A protein has these predicted regions:
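Membrane-embedded alpha-helical bundles that constitute the cytochrome b-like, heme-associated redox core
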Residues: 1-180
Length: 180
Protein backbone atom coordinates (compact mmCIF):
# COMPACT_ATOMS: atom_id res chain seq x y z
CA UNK A 1 0.00 0.00 0.00
CA UNK A 2 1.44 3.35 -1.01
CA UNK A 3 1.79 6.06 1.63
CA UNK A 4 -0.87 8.72 1.23
CA UNK A 5 -0.10 12.40 1.77
CA UNK A 6 -3.20 13.21 3.81
CA UNK A 7 -4.49 11.67 6.99
CA UNK A 8 -7.35 9.21 6.84
CA UNK A 9 -9.45 7.53 9.50
CA UNK A 10 -6.88 4.76 9.99
CA UNK A 11 -3.45 6.41 9.95
CA UNK A 12 -1.61 9.68 9.61
CA UNK A 13 -0.39 10.66 6.15
CA UNK A 14 3.14 11.41 4.99
CA UNK A 15 2.95 15.15 5.70
CA UNK A 16 1.72 14.69 9.28
CA UNK A 17 4.35 12.01 9.92
CA UNK A 18 7.12 14.09 8.40
CA UNK A 19 6.20 17.11 10.51
CA UNK A 20 5.89 14.96 13.65
CA UNK A 21 9.29 13.27 13.29
CA UNK A 22 11.11 16.42 12.12
CA UNK A 23 9.85 18.23 15.20
CA UNK A 24 10.72 15.26 17.42
CA UNK A 25 14.31 15.33 16.17
CA UNK A 26 14.63 19.11 16.52
CA UNK A 27 13.09 19.12 20.00
CA UNK A 28 15.49 16.34 21.01
CA UNK A 29 18.36 18.53 19.74
CA UNK A 30 17.08 21.53 21.72
CA UNK A 31 16.65 19.66 24.99
CA UNK A 32 19.91 17.75 24.60
CA UNK A 33 21.69 21.07 24.08
CA UNK A 34 20.19 22.51 27.24
CA UNK A 35 21.14 19.30 29.06
CA UNK A 36 24.74 19.68 27.87
CA UNK A 37 24.70 23.30 29.05
CA UNK A 38 23.52 22.24 32.52
CA UNK A 39 25.86 19.25 32.85
CA UNK A 40 29.03 20.48 31.11
CA UNK A 41 28.76 24.22 31.64
CA UNK A 42 30.93 26.51 29.53
CA UNK A 43 32.81 24.45 26.96
CA UNK A 44 33.29 24.44 23.18
CA UNK A 45 30.62 21.75 22.74
CA UNK A 46 28.19 23.84 24.77
CA UNK A 47 28.96 26.97 22.78
CA UNK A 48 28.35 25.09 19.53
CA UNK A 49 25.16 23.39 20.67
CA UNK A 50 23.60 26.37 22.40
CA UNK A 51 24.69 28.52 19.44
CA UNK A 52 22.12 26.67 17.31
CA UNK A 53 19.31 27.12 19.85
CA UNK A 54 17.74 30.27 18.36
CA UNK A 55 17.93 29.03 14.79
CA UNK A 56 16.41 25.66 15.62
CA UNK A 57 13.78 27.47 17.69
CA UNK A 58 12.76 29.57 14.69
CA UNK A 59 12.49 26.41 12.59
CA UNK A 60 10.38 24.76 15.30
CA UNK A 61 8.09 27.79 15.52
CA UNK A 62 7.59 27.64 11.75
CA UNK A 63 6.98 23.89 11.80
CA UNK A 64 4.41 24.03 14.60
CA UNK A 65 2.44 26.70 12.76
CA UNK A 66 2.52 24.57 9.58
CA UNK A 67 1.70 21.46 11.60
CA UNK A 68 -1.26 23.10 13.34
CA UNK A 69 -2.64 24.41 10.05
CA UNK A 70 -2.15 21.01 8.43
CA UNK A 71 -3.90 19.36 11.39
CA UNK A 72 -6.86 21.72 11.07
CA UNK A 73 -7.01 21.02 7.33
CA UNK A 74 -7.10 17.28 8.06
CA UNK A 75 -9.30 17.50 11.18
CA UNK A 76 -12.24 15.58 9.71
CA UNK A 77 -10.10 12.81 8.22
CA UNK A 78 -7.68 12.14 11.11
CA UNK A 79 -7.78 8.90 13.09
CA UNK A 80 -10.27 9.19 15.97
CA UNK A 81 -8.97 9.39 19.54
CA UNK A 82 -11.94 7.53 20.93
CA UNK A 83 -14.40 8.49 23.62
CA UNK A 84 -14.63 8.39 27.37
CA UNK A 85 -11.91 9.36 29.80
CA UNK A 86 -8.99 8.22 27.63
CA UNK A 87 -10.31 9.93 24.52
CA UNK A 88 -10.64 13.18 26.45
CA UNK A 89 -7.18 12.68 27.96
CA UNK A 90 -5.69 12.25 24.48
CA UNK A 91 -7.37 15.42 23.22
CA UNK A 92 -6.26 17.46 26.25
CA UNK A 93 -2.74 16.03 26.07
CA UNK A 94 -2.33 16.83 22.39
CA UNK A 95 -3.79 20.30 22.86
CA UNK A 96 -1.29 20.92 25.67
CA UNK A 97 1.59 19.69 23.49
CA UNK A 98 0.57 21.90 20.57
CA UNK A 99 0.03 24.93 22.83
CA UNK A 100 3.42 24.52 24.50
CA UNK A 101 5.19 23.89 21.17
CA UNK A 102 3.75 27.21 19.98
CA UNK A 103 4.07 29.28 23.16
CA UNK A 104 7.68 28.36 24.06
CA UNK A 105 9.30 29.58 20.81
CA UNK A 106 6.81 32.46 20.49
CA UNK A 107 7.95 33.74 23.90
CA UNK A 108 11.56 33.49 22.75
CA UNK A 109 10.75 35.52 19.63
CA UNK A 110 8.96 38.11 21.77
CA UNK A 111 12.04 38.33 24.00
CA UNK A 112 14.36 38.61 21.02
CA UNK A 113 12.31 41.37 19.41
CA UNK A 114 11.92 43.19 22.71
CA UNK A 115 15.66 43.02 23.37
CA UNK A 116 16.30 45.43 20.50
CA UNK A 117 19.10 43.15 19.29
CA UNK A 118 19.29 41.73 15.79
CA UNK A 119 18.45 38.09 15.11
CA UNK A 120 20.44 36.22 12.52
CA UNK A 121 19.36 32.65 11.83
CA UNK A 122 21.79 30.55 9.81
CA UNK A 123 23.18 33.69 8.19
CA UNK A 124 19.81 35.30 7.44
CA UNK A 125 18.83 38.46 9.31
CA UNK A 126 15.26 38.06 10.58
CA UNK A 127 15.18 41.00 12.99
CA UNK A 128 17.26 44.14 12.44
CA UNK A 129 17.17 45.40 16.01
CA UNK A 130 18.79 48.69 16.93
CA UNK A 131 16.16 49.98 19.35
CA UNK A 132 16.04 50.19 23.12
CA UNK A 133 14.92 47.18 25.11
CA UNK A 134 11.16 46.88 25.60
CA UNK A 135 10.76 45.41 29.10
CA UNK A 136 7.10 44.41 28.72
CA UNK A 137 8.24 42.13 25.89
CA UNK A 138 11.36 40.70 27.50
CA UNK A 139 10.02 40.20 31.04
CA UNK A 140 7.33 37.57 30.26
CA UNK A 141 9.72 35.58 28.10
CA UNK A 142 12.50 35.77 30.67
CA UNK A 143 10.07 34.50 33.29
CA UNK A 144 8.33 31.79 31.27
CA UNK A 145 10.36 30.53 28.28
CA UNK A 146 12.65 28.18 30.19
CA UNK A 147 10.03 27.07 32.69
CA UNK A 148 7.47 26.27 29.99
CA UNK A 149 10.15 24.50 27.96
CA UNK A 150 10.68 22.08 30.86
CA UNK A 151 6.90 21.66 31.14
CA UNK A 152 6.93 20.84 27.42
CA UNK A 153 9.64 18.24 28.04
CA UNK A 154 7.48 16.68 30.77
CA UNK A 155 4.50 16.63 28.37
CA UNK A 156 6.67 14.98 25.70
CA UNK A 157 7.78 12.37 28.25
CA UNK A 158 4.11 11.72 29.05
CA UNK A 159 3.37 11.40 25.34
CA UNK A 160 6.19 8.87 24.90
CA UNK A 161 5.05 6.96 28.00
CA UNK A 162 1.54 6.64 26.56
CA UNK A 163 2.95 5.47 23.22
CA UNK A 164 4.77 2.71 25.12
CA UNK A 165 1.61 1.84 27.10
CA UNK A 166 -0.39 1.57 23.87
CA UNK A 167 2.23 -0.61 22.22
CA UNK A 168 3.42 -2.90 25.00
CA UNK A 169 0.53 -3.07 27.49
CA UNK A 170 -2.68 -2.38 25.62
CA UNK A 171 -1.32 -3.76 22.30
CA UNK A 172 -3.90 -1.74 20.39
CA UNK A 173 -1.93 -0.83 17.26
CA UNK A 174 -2.31 2.93 17.82
CA UNK A 175 1.45 3.33 17.36
CA UNK A 176 1.12 2.10 13.79
CA UNK A 177 -0.87 5.21 12.90
CA UNK A 178 2.32 7.27 13.11
CA UNK A 179 5.06 4.79 12.20
CA UNK A 180 3.75 2.22 9.72
Amino acid sequence: MAMQWRDDGFRYGAVTRGLHWAMALLLTWQFAGMGVKIIVGKAPITAFWVGTHKGIGVILLTLIVVRALWGLYNMKTRPAHGGGFWGLAVKVGHLALYALMLIVPALAMLRQYGSGKPLDVFGVRLIDGGWAEVPWMTAPANAAHGLLAWVLLAAIAGHILMVLVHHFIWKDEKVGRMIS
